[in-house]
Amino acid sequence: MSKKKSKEKYPIATISAIVVIVLLVLTFLCISKPLDTKSYKIESRKSEVAAYKEKNTDYIVDGWLKVQGTNIDYPVIISTDDVSINNMLDDFTWKEENPKELTKRTVIYGHNFKNISSTPLITDSTHSRFEQLISFIYYDFAKDNQFIQYTKDGVDYLFQIFSVSLIDDYDLIQSGYLDEEELKDYLKKSLDDSYFKYDIDVDENDKIITLITCTRFFGGLKSTRFKIDGKLLEKDEKAILSKVSTKSNYQEIEEILKGGKSNEKTA
């Protein structure tokens, strides 16, 4: 009788061992799997650049800008003495510099006539220029939208965001002509100022893009700029969402956002 029971135990023990091994393998796969494998696919804007250049011969058309998750999908023009940025009716973005090729830092500006909102500004088709850029101040939006597409000279460049910040106007570094040491200093400050920590490596050997707009986030009497920085991805580099977390300085943002719809006043 005891021998029969002993024989019956072996298959059960074997099955149990197999189940344990399978569970361990599945657990390892779940742990080693990236937190998010969502990727971004470039939508070329080469034809849009060509068409806009043909239609607008009075402007120096630099290229095209497209920002993930927003309706920012506009031409980039060069600001000159002959072009009044404040009087243009088209939706556009602009640059103050006109280098022949991609520099260490590309700086692009856009108007914002809206104040902060109680929710990300991504659902209203009437929003224009850089009015939806401020949506990146919201953590959930920032972690799900990380890519900036910039088309110039027949090339669709892709940048991945590594810094989102609000800075005083006098702290704004506007030049794109930075040497490696200057870029190194800029990157340190940009990463320090950022409200989010992106799991992205960036250094002075990279090329970056900076998007800048005005905001009344801290009130109408304070001259504040909203700024996003992204690093250029190489052609063979996959555009995969990185891990994003809030930093301790994000607490001041959370306090302001408690104002809800009262923040939406434009005056």
Q: What are the functions of these language-model segments?
A:
Residues 27-267:
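Solvent-exposed, non-transmembrane regions of membrane-associated and secreted proteins
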Residues 1-2, 158:
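Intrinsically disordered, low-complexity sequence elements enriched in Ser/Thr/Gly/Pro
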Residues 3-20:
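N-terminal Sec-pathway targeting helices
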Residues 16-32:
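N-terminal type II signal-anchor transmembrane helix
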